[in-house]
């Protein structure tokens, strides 16, 4: 009777090890779920960024105000008879 119990205990330990630590076990599934959640958040950030960039592109295509704002802020252009003061901190 004792050898059968020892074999069953060894088999139980082996199965538990495979369940928890082997490839496809609970630990690896947990790590995969964390990676999936991280990737979902990263994808959402990129979607938001793309949406903002598409809105900027649309403004530049159809709005003169956006073009003027871009020229003033990014390129440092000014209108005729206008004085530009740049304050350096």
Curated annotation (Swiss-Prot):
Chain coiled-coil ranges: 29-62
Protein topology in the membrane: Single-pass type II membrane protein
GO cellular component annotations of the record: cell division site; cell septum; plasma membrane
UniProt topological domain (Periplasmic) ranges: 22-89
Subcellular location as annotated: Cell inner membrane
Transmembrane feature ranges: 4-21
GO biological process terms held by the UniProt record: FtsZ-dependent cytokinesis
Domain of life where this protein originates: Bacteria
Keywords tagged on the record: Cell cycle, Cell division, Cell inner membrane, Cell membrane, Coiled coil, Membrane, Transmembrane, Transmembrane helix
Membrane-side (Cytoplasmic) residue stretches: 1-3
Subunit structure: Part of a complex composed of FtsB, FtsL and FtsQ.
Chain's role: Essential cell division protein. May link together the upstream cell division proteins, which are predominantly cytoplasmic, with the downstream cell division proteins, which are predominantly periplasmic.
NCBIfam families found in the cross-reference section: PRK00888.1
Entry's family note: Belongs to the FtsB family.
Name of the protein: Cell division protein FtsB
Organism field: Coxiella burnetii (strain RSA 493 / Nine Mile phase I)
Lineage: Bacteria, Pseudomonadati, Pseudomonadota, Gammaproteobacteria, Legionellales
Name of the coding gene: ftsB
């Amino acid at each position: 009777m004792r050898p059968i119990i020892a074999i069953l205990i060894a088999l139980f330990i082996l199965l538990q090890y495979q369940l928890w630590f082997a490839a496809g076990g609970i630990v690896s599934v947990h790590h995969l779920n964390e990676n999936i959640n991280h990737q979902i958040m990263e994808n959402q950030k990129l979607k938001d960024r793309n949406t903002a960039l598409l809105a900027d592109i649309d403004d530049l295509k159809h709005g003169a105000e956006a073009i003027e704002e871009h020229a003033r802020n990014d390129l440092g252009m000014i209108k005729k008879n206008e004085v530009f003061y740049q304050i350096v901190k």
